[in-house]
């Protein structure tokens, strides 16, 4: 069955490179084209008209249909002469056939640009068939599911390419016995690719059941028409392919920004796995000029992937609008059952019954108490758990991280250091009783009432001593001195910016052990042992024995009670900064060392 007249003859093209099936360079060497091979098929009979190869080596030679050139420029010139002689001069239309369209749309233009080669117009904006896509189209038409990655070996096996004679036994090509030893691997692959094209058309013709045209290899990709439309419409949209499946919005934005263009919006396509990208997407720019400049980055690498950046249009974007979503914002992929804390937004593993960061009860506790499977708190920053929490965190200095091994320690330090998302909201604010933990205490200073963790020896808000505070006895006890009203959020600490904190935020992080000892004697971090006062589990003072503590010159004591070596500029526990010239606050208790 002949191909449509608009398709014309087929030029099966194959490049021998150091890329694997995924377009990634093998080894550390940059991508290079080692050989160009081509086979010309008649568009009406599918008979092979000509085949040739040109290897890129240091010396130039020719052995029949196999030749070599000293540079890519000479190899492209040889290919152009062959096409001009057999097709263009005779006025025959033709279409390229490649295993992967990226070879002709990305790889060849990149190599030509890097080496300063001017490609013929039909190679800069080719008309081509992507054989892997055409094969997938045929598989879907037959009711089969094509593999995620279609390789040459897969196509050759499914189409039984070896049923056709190899190049050395073909009668269509006059090959002398002396030339047979010079047949290269690349030319053999190109010949098999031409056989696969022929077999695919035959199978499609058989399956078309009387239709005038086959179902494959009828509508080529016309890069020249796409480019004309892009510049005529002054489009601001480009299509990007070749991305890794876990690329994030920030990575892609930064990549374009680093190359001098600033994208306005980026989208990828929906996938069954919500946290996984398809490796393709659309990028919208503020102006047509920026989008045109972005096309010049076609073939540039993001990591170890070579990107394909081609023109697109508003029409294409509108047709795909129903399946477009933003790129993932993070590489973390929550597993089924993981839940987001409605109070601080922290992502917790399924097994956790309370939030790892702020101890807010998990969904199992709430559902057990209310008989519901979802959170339904009267939450001022979101209507359900997992929604609106990022707004809460943005206003109160928190951050959202998945509770994996790499972020556990840093999240604990944030929890200890800034207390921006403590678990002391009132029971009425969150639809359930949120008790203090044993040892937690509420500041007794007038007008403060701040809820401090048990480790805090002084109020983190006003600096008042813990000695005058009321202490919760155990987990069963509610907030001391009553609970907060529904609209009261005065106990939320001030927002902590990312700029270096002032002395009022970390009032005790500036103290050195030796300066405290000089002002308060041996009872504070001194070298003598003895009995010191500590709070017991019921909030009462008790005398406990303390072993001798030896501190080095310059060691300093943080607000959280952690003793840091002098070399540390930030507290190891809470990350509070240390300023050696800060004065000791008057509210520092004389027995401060008892809580270290």
Curated annotation (Swiss-Prot):
GO cellular component, one term: cytoplasm
Cellular localization per UniProt: Chromosome; Nucleus; Cytoplasm; Cytoplasmic granule
SMART domains: RRM (SM00360), ZnF_RBZ (SM00547)
Record's signal peptide: none
Residue ranges occupied by any RRM domain in the UniProt entry: 236-314
Main location: nucleus
Ranges annotated as RanBP2-type zinc finger: 335-364, 437-468, 552-580
One Pfam family per UniProt: Zn_ribbon_RanBP
Superkingdom as given in the UniProt entry: Eukaryota
Modified-residue entries (Phosphoserine), positions: 176, 429
GO molecular function: mRNA binding; RNA binding; zinc ion binding
Effect of disrupting the coding gene: Abolishes siRNA production from the centromeric outer repeat region. Decreases H3K9 methylation and impairs heterochromatin silencing; simultaneous disruption of dpb4 exacerbates the effect.
Domain notes: The RNA-binding domains (RRM domain and RanBP2-type zinc finger domains) are essential for DRI1 cytoplasmic localization and function.
Protein purpose: Mediates heterochromatin assembly by promoting RNAi-mediated heterochromatin silencing and histone deacetylation. Binds pericetromeric transcripts and recruits the RNA-induced transcriptional silencing (RITS) complex to heterochromatin. Recruits sir2 to chromatin to promote deacetylation of 'Lys-9' of histone H3. Involved in bipolar spindle assembly during mitosis. Required for proper localization of kinesin-14/Klp2 on the spindle microtubules.
Note: Shown to localize to the nucleolus in PMID:16823372 by overexpression of a C-terminally tagged allele, however this allele was subsequently shown to be non-functional in PMID:33693625.
Subunit description: Interacts with dpb4. Interacts with chp1.
Protein name as it appears in the record: RNA-binding protein involved in heterochromatin assembly dri1
